[in-house]
Amino acid sequence: MSAALFSLDGPARGAPWTAEPAAFYEPGRAGKPGRGAEPAASAMYDDESAIDFSAYIDSMAAVPTLELCHDELFADLFNSNHKAGALELLPGGPARLGGPGPAPRPLKREPDWGDGDAPGSLLPAQVAACAQTVVSLAAAAQPTPPASPEPPRRSPAPPAPGPARDKAAGKRGPDRGSPEYRQRRERNNIAVRKSRDKAKRRNQEMQQKLVELSAENEKLQQRVEQLTRDLAGLRRFFKQLPGAPFLPGAGAADAR
């Protein structure tokens, strides 16, 4: 019994470990450590095959993130009936439950992922498609800088409706061929002529007034020149006269 347990658990002490998978889910080992191995254990281990996850680990390491592809990535890997598999893996099969039952089905052999013709070869293609999708989404999420700043376009504001605009919209003039329109045109022409004539008369009056003021200015300048000459003659006259004999106040003061 001890020799059988030692041979199932692994090699002898000091020997290198092999790459064969360990029996982690053997029901007889976990509950009763002292119970011997059953004859069905060898057949169960013969049907088992190891799965190499190195290809998937490398592909997952190359992809930035596979959050969007987790369901698709592991859907085919673990898509099996675990309840039926557990019943088949138990030593004795359905016969242990008691009573005659259906014949035990053969164990499902895991497909070889390295074989290109097997149905499981679709999983690497799914991983590659998920990687391309994630890379494209990451590239699309990066913000692109604007090419050139464009000036903001301002939409023309609609004119505010006012009382004058409402009156102009509500009041429409007569037709151009009607006599009322002609009469209004004649009145407008007469008013324009009168305003023009009035402006001309004002211009002529201002020109005439300018001429008169210019003539008066010349006369005033001549008057100023005449007064300046008279003042100069009077100064010369008073400078030539003696000052003492002609002062009556000075003579009266001396007599006293």
From Swiss-Prot:
CDD domains registered for this protein in UniProt: bZIP_CEBPD (cd14714)
Annotated region (Basic motif), positions in chain: 182-209
Region of interest called Disordered, as start-end residue ranges on this chain: 18-40, 92-121, 139-206
Pfam families for this protein: bZIP_2
Metal-binding found in the keyword field: no
The UniProt record lists the keyword Ubl conjugation: yes
Origin superkingdom: Eukaryota
Record GO terms (molecular function): DNA-binding transcription factor activity, RNA polymerase II-specific; RNA polymerase II cis-regulatory region sequence-specific DNA binding
Name of protein: CCAAT/enhancer-binding protein delta
Gene: CEBPD
